[in-house]
Amino acid sequence: MDPTLSLNGDPNIGVYARVFEDLAVVPVEAPKEFRDKIAEALDVEVIETFVQGSSVIGLLLTGNSRGFVVSGLIQDSELEILQEYGDCLLLGEEMNAAGNVILTNDSFAVVHPDMSSAMREMVADFLKVKIIPMSFAGVGTVGMTCACTNTGVLLPARSTPEEIEKLERSIDDANVAIGTGSVNMGSGLIGTGLLINSKGYLAGNATTGYELGRIEDVFGFL
């Protein structure tokens, strides 16, 4: 299967969808071909909804096996759909684009360095993870700058050696591979162009063969 995908010609698939280990959340208007390819490549159930009445689900939603973290501006009908599949933590207006400011797996969550200590504690308690406030390549929106699973983290190519070393020390887990790369012909906003879990991945359709190779290497798909 071709490991690339677009949504109506837009390669920034991570802006519009959020993938978990057994579930993917996509916009209501996503074409059947888009939904079907995600279901097959990542071996997930696909649910359709909006968040805040918007299709930019990847920016507004994240989480791990313990539940969803989502913008506090989510509508009641949208929240009810998510709650059918897991518990939900709603972020307040201070920094509510959860998928933009949180990068998480089942062990740790890297968060925007300006996130308040109260919000960090709330996220840590809900997801049962260690909190790591950081930025990469000088960018604090870690949820869209990076991508991660329980076994790997892909950082933008312009991440500094100091940033990489700090993340390695903070995670302190030899079973989690850390590497750098890009998507969509050099974009450092990796999360905007990559949907990934332990079973597979899909990258934006502008992603080059070299970039696909880096993804497969870091996440162990080779």
Curated annotation (Swiss-Prot):
Keyword presence, ATP-binding: no
GO biological process terms, semicolon-separated: cytosolic ribosome assembly
UniProt-listed SUPFAM superfamilies: Pentein (SSF55909)
UniProt entry keywords in alphabetical sequence: Initiation factor, Protein biosynthesis
InterPro entries noted in UniProt: eIF6 (IPR002769)
Superkingdom of the source species: Archaea
GO MF annotations in UniProt: ribosome binding; translation initiation factor activity
Glycosyltransferase recorded as keyword: no
Functional summary from the UniProt entry: Binds to the 50S ribosomal subunit and prevents its association with the 30S ribosomal subunit to form the 70S initiation complex.
PANTHER family in the cross-refs: TRANSLATION INITIATION FACTOR 6
Similarity comment: Belongs to the eIF-6 family.
Name of this chain's protein: Translation initiation factor 6
